[in-house]
Curated annotation (Swiss-Prot):
The gene is petD. The chain crosses the membrane at residues 36-56, 95-115, 131-151. GO terms for biological process: photosynthetic electron transport chain. The lineage of its organism: Eukaryota, Viridiplantae, Chlorophyta, core chlorophytes, Chlorophyceae. InterPro entries: Cyt_b/b6_C (IPR005798), Cyt_b/b6_C_sf (IPR036150), Cyt_b6/f_cplx_suIV (IPR005870), Cytochrome_b_C_euk/bac (IPR048260). It comes from Chlamydomonas moewusii (Chlamydomonas eugametos). SUPFAM superfamilies: a domain/subunit of cytochrome bc1 complex (Ubiquinol-cytochrome c reductase). It is found in: Plastid, Chloroplast thylakoid membrane. Belongs to the cytochrome b family. PetD subfamily. This is Cytochrome b6-f complex subunit 4. Component of the cytochrome b6-f complex, which mediates electron transfer between photosystem II (PSII) and photosystem I (PSI), cyclic electron flow around PSI, and state transitions. GO terms for molecular function: electron transporter, transferring electrons within cytochrome b6/f complex of photosystem II activity; electron transporter, transferring electrons within the cyclic electron transport pathway of photosynthesis activity; oxidoreductase activity. GO terms for cellular component: chloroplast thylakoid membrane.
C-alpha cells in the first residue's frame, strides 16, 4: 500500500502561498527541490530516449536525387511557411505583403500591453488574449490550407 502525501489545506501559510499562485505545485509541495531534482531529469531522459529510439528504429529515408534541369510546375515551401507564402502570393503589392507579414509579430507584441490590466493567468479570465489566439490560429490554418491550392481558388478554398 502506498502512502500519498496530501497537503494540509488548513495551514494559513500554505493557503496564503496557494492564493498567490506560486511556490507550490498542484500537490502543495515546494517546487524547489522536488521539481528540479526529480521530475525534470526524468522528463529530459525520457525525451532523449524517445528521440534516440526513433532515430535508431525509424531512420529518415533518402529521397530521389535532385535534377537541376527538371523543376516542378509549382514550387511550395515547407508546411510551416504556408501561411506566409499565401500572404505573399495573394497580396498584389510586394511591399504590402511584407508589411502584412510584419504586422503579425507586431500585433502579438501588443497583446501583453492590452492584457496588462488583467492579473489573472487563467485563459478563461483573459478573453482578449484567448480570442486573439483562436482567431489567429484559424486564420493561419485557413491560409496554410489555401497555400496548397492553385492561386485562383486559394483564398476561398473552392467553397464559394
Amino acid at each position: 500500500m502506498s502512502v500519498t502525501k496530501k497537503p494540509d489545506l488548513n495551514d494559513p501559510v500554505l493557503r496564503a502561498k496557494l492564493a498567490k499562485g506560486f511556490g507550490h505545485n498542484t500537490y502543495g509541495e515546494p517546487a524547489w527541490p522536488n521539481d528540479l531534482l526529480y521530475i525534470f531529469p526524468v522528463v529530459i531522459f525520457g525525451t532523449f530516449a524517445c528521440c534516440i529510439g526513433l532515430a535508431v528504429l525509424d531512420p529518415a529515408a533518402m529521397g530521389e536525387p535532385a535534377n537541376p534541369f527538371a523543376t516542378p510546375l509549382e514550387i511550395l515551401p515547407e508546411w510551416y511557411f504556408y501561411p506566409v507564402f499565401q500572404i505573399l502570393r495573394t497580396v498584389p503589392n510586394k511591399l504590402l505583403g511584407v508589411l502584412a507579414m510584419a504586422a503579425v509579430p507586431v500585433g502579438l507584441l501588443t497583446v501583453p500591453f492590452i492584457e496588462s490590466i488583467n492579473k489573472f493567468q487563467n485563459p478563461y479570465r483573459r478573453p482578449i488574449a484567448t480570442i486573439l489566439f483562436l482567431v489567429g490560429t484559424l486564420v493561419a490554418v485557413w491560409l496554410g490550407i489555401g497555400a496548397t491550392f492553385p492561386i485562383d481558388i486559394s483564398l476561398t478554398l473552392g467553397l464559394f
